[in-house]
Regions:
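Catalytic phosphate/metal-binding cores of nucleic-acid and nucleotide-processing enzymes, i.e., regions
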Residues: 1-147
């Protein structure tokens, strides 16, 4: 059975291939995948830390920030997205992260990546993922096909 998050991965990767053909990216297909105990143990040995984001876009870009009423742009070394299926609630009404060990671990990794010069975010659903990607990479750069 295909999970909602797996479909989201496929759709986002398809969008990137079609709309940003020169941009390099990698998605972690093993994320959420059912593995045998042996496969899971082997996979764990190759990882430094749990909760690594689902998608990495290897393209520098700019993100907008606001401070003291001023708007500026920061250059980032690449973008990491942790993709969540549509409807997943990450935050409480007061804006704090919901109590969930796995999501808290993911948020910690995203924070560390942001501190290291990357743009790292949660993206809930296809529309939010595409908006974050477009804000970071700019408008799609379709290749012209000449005959």
């Amino acid at each position: 059975m295909i999970k909602k998050e797996e479909i989201l991965h496929l759709k986002v990767c398809d969008y990137l291939r079609k709309n940003y053909p020169d941009v390099l990216f990698r998605t972690d297909f093993s994320s959420g995948m059912k593995m045998s105990p042996g496969q899971a143990a082997k996979h764990k040995k190759f990882q430094r830390k749990r909760a690594w984001p689902d998608l990495f876009i290897a393209e520098s870009g700019f993100v907008e920030f606001k401070e003291d009423g001023l708007i500026g742009h920061l250059r980032k070394n690449g973008m990491f997205l942790e993709l969540k299926a549509d409807g997943v609630k990450l935050y409480k009404k007061d804006g704090t992260l919901r109590k969930n060990k796995h999501i808290e671990e993911q948020a910690e990794i995203l924070d560390k990546l942001n501190e290291s010069g990357y743009y790292a975010r949660f993206a809930v659903g296809y529309d939010e993922a595409i908006q974050i990607i477009t804000d970071y990479l700019g408008e799609p750069k379709h290749k012209k096909v000449e005959f």
